[in-house]
Amino acid sequence: MLSLSASAADVGAVQRAKALAELMVLDTPDEQSFDDLVFVAAKACGVPIALITLLDTDRQWFKAKYGLDVCETDIEHSVCRIDIDKGDLLEIVDLTADARTKRNPLVTGEKHFRAYAGAPLVLRSGAVVGRLCVIDTAPRPAGLSEMERAMLQALARLASENLELRRIAKASERLTELQTALVEIGEVIRSSSGTEEMTSGTSAIVGRTLATDR
């Protein structure tokens, strides 16, 4: 059970969905800059699993993963979403003993999740889109050390900034594509011998350009 009120959670979910749409990152291929962060997180915290988790409306999708062989799971099974809109580090030292997670299939099933810590991914807009988390297959009664917590939070900030920079780069690429399309349309208009040729040429350019948004 999540601790936020339904209304607050709804607002956070709407803000998150909007931010993820703007990031244009869901279902994209692996990227070394993100893969490196989960590798370092796992090694720094001494755990077998680390993930950069983005919380979509009906699933949690992993932009980067270390030690896990799936790309996403149902949002209902997400530990990362617990108290997500508080924007704080979440740590559960024994997932089998916590009422919020003890019946989670990722805990009771073959994945055998036992301990969890996740730092929020907070964008410049304030939207919290997910967590950088580390997971152990054995309980950790003492939890993370102060240094490990600080490292996890620092890596989460780097992941958040990486998401922002990726968005800016993609927006710049898109602007270049649109500018190129306008130049091509101008050339078609100048070189066309008639309306039919002009319409056909410009339609092809517009169709190709819009297709990249899908």
Task: Write out the residue ranges for each language-model feature.
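A short, aliphatic-rich beta-strand micro-motif
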Residues: 114-125
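Amphipathic alpha-helical "output/dimerization" segments
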Residues: 143-164
